[in-house]
């Protein structure tokens, strides 16, 4: 739990302030802010490193403490049971009064909670979750979410349709694939999609310059480095930051020069894909 002195603007879950890579996203921030205030569910889509988590982090951080503290954030889930257990655990850590009443009725204590939760069936976990959230004024953020199964989609639909709990999905698959899936499962359209695109050239250069200072690259020979990195990164903010971080490692330097092609290859080999949707 977060101590009382640190509770301002803190979501329920491990969502750090993403201000360092929050660049030129004011229109997207306004759209997300509006959706949260109006309790509208949303899918936030884009390639790895585009800034989805940073966008959510910054928007929540800017909300008053009472609203920010009702944001339930999960980073990656394995399956339906994992999703349900993580959500119930977050509500327990937030001392949700509806859940606490359920636990008191069943005689569950602080010492027995973990074992009780582990022993619940999927149907009991669903009932426990739904009863807890329907009067709790929560917003649920699901980050790094795998492709949806019908069982998981059913829980998400129950949350935002029947329990007045909007859900925000942060996904990195191709836009067309996700739209088809969400349309089939939730009857969502383009209105429920917030697609993050690469930064404008000016913003990408500004971010690059801040990274050059941040990672101590200014003493190196940066001839052609700026132009090459902006081009190779495809103006994806996470790619700019991570490739600059790699460039600060002496293994990627030859004398005073940066081995930018090696940086780029190792960045891709680490699992990042810069194939961007056109359109």
Residue spans for each PLM region:
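A short helix-turn-beta junction within AAA+ P-loop NTPase domains corresponding to the substrate/partner-engaging
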Residues: 182-197
């Amino acid at each position: 739990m977060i101590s009382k002195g640190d509770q301002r603007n803190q979501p329920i879950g491990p969502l750090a302030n993403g201000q360092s890579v929050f660049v030129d996203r004011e229109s997207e921030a306004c759209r997300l802010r509006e959706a949260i205030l109006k309790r509208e569910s949303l899918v936030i889509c884009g390639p790895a490193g585009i800034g989805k988590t940073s966008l959510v982090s910054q928007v929540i951080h800017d909300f008053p403490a009472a609203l920010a503290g009702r944001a339930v954030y999960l980073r990656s889930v394995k399956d339906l049971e994992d999703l349900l257990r993580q959500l119930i655990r977050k509500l327990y850590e937030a001392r949700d009064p509806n859940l606490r009443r359920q636990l008191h009725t069943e005689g569950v204590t602080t010492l027995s909670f973990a074992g009780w939760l582990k022993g619940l069936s999927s149907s009991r976990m669903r009932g426990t979750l739904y009863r807890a959230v329907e009067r709790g004024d929560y917003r649920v953020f699901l980050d790094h979410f795998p492709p949806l199964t019908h069982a998981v989609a059913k829980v998400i639909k129950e949350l935002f349709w029947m329990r007045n709990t909007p859900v925000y999905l942060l996904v990195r698959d191709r836009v067309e694939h996700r739209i088809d899936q969400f349309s089939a499962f939730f009857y969502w359209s383009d209105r429920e999609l917030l697609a993050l695109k690469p930064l404008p050239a000016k913003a990408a250069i500004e971010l690059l310059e801040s990274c050059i200072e941040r990672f101590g690259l200014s003493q190196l020979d940066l001839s052609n480095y700026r132009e090459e990195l902006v081009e190779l990164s495809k103006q994806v903010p996470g790619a700019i930051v991570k490739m600059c971080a790699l460039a600060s490692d002496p293994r990627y330097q030859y004398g005073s020069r940066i081995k930018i092609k090696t940086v780029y290859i190792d960045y891709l080999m680490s699992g990042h894909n810069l194939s961007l949707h056109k359109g």
